[in-house]
Each structure stands twice: as structure tokens, then as C-alpha cells.
């Protein structure tokens, strides 16, 4: 997907500001590619490593704890000027923070019920539709159709359907949230300086998730659990944000968008390595279809 549209991931790991295409050196591009891969790996392996926390505290509790740590750490670094923002700025971060909290909770609820690779592929349909329709490319609906076929292949292992209806619905909800997140981050990124928009939206997300997450997690908290969650908050979303921000300064946004299309494949790989979620050849082909559809939509959007 093109970075002009995808300015945030499942966990807010991407930049909140649009970046123009650049023509950096070959060495800079290579470093940017490495940073993109590292960012996607952080996001997907971070999601896989979150499985024990989701089981211990529930999806709402895991979301709340991670947002509290991430928002607190970033607020200390950025020091947003809370009292100086206008009404329109507040409305923007309130909307973005609410969407972020709901999106993350929905995604965690999905991966608690269905394989990670399937959840990521379904969720990816949201930004894929934005990339297809956002540039007026109604004729390019072929790409979302390809991706949907890929999702169907992922959902069937040759013997039975691997997902359940609640998990699939949560993944669809996360995808819808991601699509809204993309549209909102463009507005918030333009309304704030530097990282203030990201910091404020994470603070709002932490507050929004508190009524649900605190009740789910508070009675189960341990010292080791807090350290584990703090580490995961660094892994997602803070480290991916930094990696992607630096990567975008070293490579064209079109190349960045194509690379980020690999995220469903990395999600499936993380599920296999961390969660022992194997894939059949047809499921691998389904993942390839989703990735190919994303790359195709990115290329046509860049041309359009």
C-alpha cells in the first residue's frame, strides 16, 4: 500500500505525516528496506508474542496495558502541549485515539480465536480497499477481489475451516478500523507538529480502553507481567514507528508501500514460528494472493 494512504498500522506503527517521494542513494535504499522488514517483523512477531498476555489478561486487558506503557513512554519523550491545542485538533486525536483502541482490541480478539496469518490477511482488506478506492480507482476492484479469494484459501486447510465466526468478525472489524485509522492519520498528521499527534492519539487510546481493560487485567497483574508488557510496548508500536519514519527518509514512498505489502506473509510466518500454526500449500498460495493484490493496488495507485 502507498504510504500516502497507509500512515499507520494495526498498532500505530507507521508515520503520522505524509512524506514525498525521494531519490536517495543505493545504500540509503538498502538501509530503508532493512528497516521496513524490521518494522513489519516487530509488528507481527510482537502480535504473536502477545498471545500469552492476551490469554492472561484478555484482549481488552492486553490492549489497555500495552497502550498505557506505549503512550506513557512516548509522552515523556514528546511532551505534548496538551493545553495549547485547538478544538479541531482535539476532535482529531479523540477520533483517532478511539479508533486505535477499538482496532487493537478487535485485532487481539481475532488472534485469540483464529490463526495470526488469517487474521492479518482479513485485516489487510481494509487498507487495500482504501488504497484502491482512495485514488478513484473503481476499475481496480480486481485487487480486493483477489485478496478476498486469498483469504478464503487461508481460511480452509483442505479438511476444515480453520477460523470461527467471532474471530473472523473481529478481524473484519479490525480491518474496518485500520481503514478509518488511515484516513484519520492524514488529518491528524497535518494538524500537529512532529510526534505530537501520535503521542496524543495514544494517550486518548489508553484512556478509552481503560474502562474495559482495567477490569479485565487489574486482578491478574504481576511484576514480571508488567515487565513483559513494557517490552512488548517497545516492540509495538514505538520501535516500528521509529524504523518506518527513518526508512521513509531513505527510500521512495512507492517502494515503501510495496514492501509493506509483505506484512500478511510475515504475519503467517510469525504465526508458524511462534504459535506453531502450520500452513498448507493452498494457504500459502492464499497468502501470496493477498500480498500480490496489495502490491498490485500500490503500483496502480502510484500510476494513477
Where are the language model's segments positioned?
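Hydrophobic transmembrane alpha-helices of multi-pass small-molecule transport proteins
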Residues: 6, 98, 125, 139-158, ...
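Hydrophobic alpha-helical transmembrane segments of multi-pass integral membrane proteins
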Residues: 31-35, 61-76, 140-146, 166-173, ...
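Membrane-interface helix caps and helix-loop-helix hairpins in membrane proteins
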Residues: 108-113, 137, 157-165, 187, ...
Amino acid at each position: 500500500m502507498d504510504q500516502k494512504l497507509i500512515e499507520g498500522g494495526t498498532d500505530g506503527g507507521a508515520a503520522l505525516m505524509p512524506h514525498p517521494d525521494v531519490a536517495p542513494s543505493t545504500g540509503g535504499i538498502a538501509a530503508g528496506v532493512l528497516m521496513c522488514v524490521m518494522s513489519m517483523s516487530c509488528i507481527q512477531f510482537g502480535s504473536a508474542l502477545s498471545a500469552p498476555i492476551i490469554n492472561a489478561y484478555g484482549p481488552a486487558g492486553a490492549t489497555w496495558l500495552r497502550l498505557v506503557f506505549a503512550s506513557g513512554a512516548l509522552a515523556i519523550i514528546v511532551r505534548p502541549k496538551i493545553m495549547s491545542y485547538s478544538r479541531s485538533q482535539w476532535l482529531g486525536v479523540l477520533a483517532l485515539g478511539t479508533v486505535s483502541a477499538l482496532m487493537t482490541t478487535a485485532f487481539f480478539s481475532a488472534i485469540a480465536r483464529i490463526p495470526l496469518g488469517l487474521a492479518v490477511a482479513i485485516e489487510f482488506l481494509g487498507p487495500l480497499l482504501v488504497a484502491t478506492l482512495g485514488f478513484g480507482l473503481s476499475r481496480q476492484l480486481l485487487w480486493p477481489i483477489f485478496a478476498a479469494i486469498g483469504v478464503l484459501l487461508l481460511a480452509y486447510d483442505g479438511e476444515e475451516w480453520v477460523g470461527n465466526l467471532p474471530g473472523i468478525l473481529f478481524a473484519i472489524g479490525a480491518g474496518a478500523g485500520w481503514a478509518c485509522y488511515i484516513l484519520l492519520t492524514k488529518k491528524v498528521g497535518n494538524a500537529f507538529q512532529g510526534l505530537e499527534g501520535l503521542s496524543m492519539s495514544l494517550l486518548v487510546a489508553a484512556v478509552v480502553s481503560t474502562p474495559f481493560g482495567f477490569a479485565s487485567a487489574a486482578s491478574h497483574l504481576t511484576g514480571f507481567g508488567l515487565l513483559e508488557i513494557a517490552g512488548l510496548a517497545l516492540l509495538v508500536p514505538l520501535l516500528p514507528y521509529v524504523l518506518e519514519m527513518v526508512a521513509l527518509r531513505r527510500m521512495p514512498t512507492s517502494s515503501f508501500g510495496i514492501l509493506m505489502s509483505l506484512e500478511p506473509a510475515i504475519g503467517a510466518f510469525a504465526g508458524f514460528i511462534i504459535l506453531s500454526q502450520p500452513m498448507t500449500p493452498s494457504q500459502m498460495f492464499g497468502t501470496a494472493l493477498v500480498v500480490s493484490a496489495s502490491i498490485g493496488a500500490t503500483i496502480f495507485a502510484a500510476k494513477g
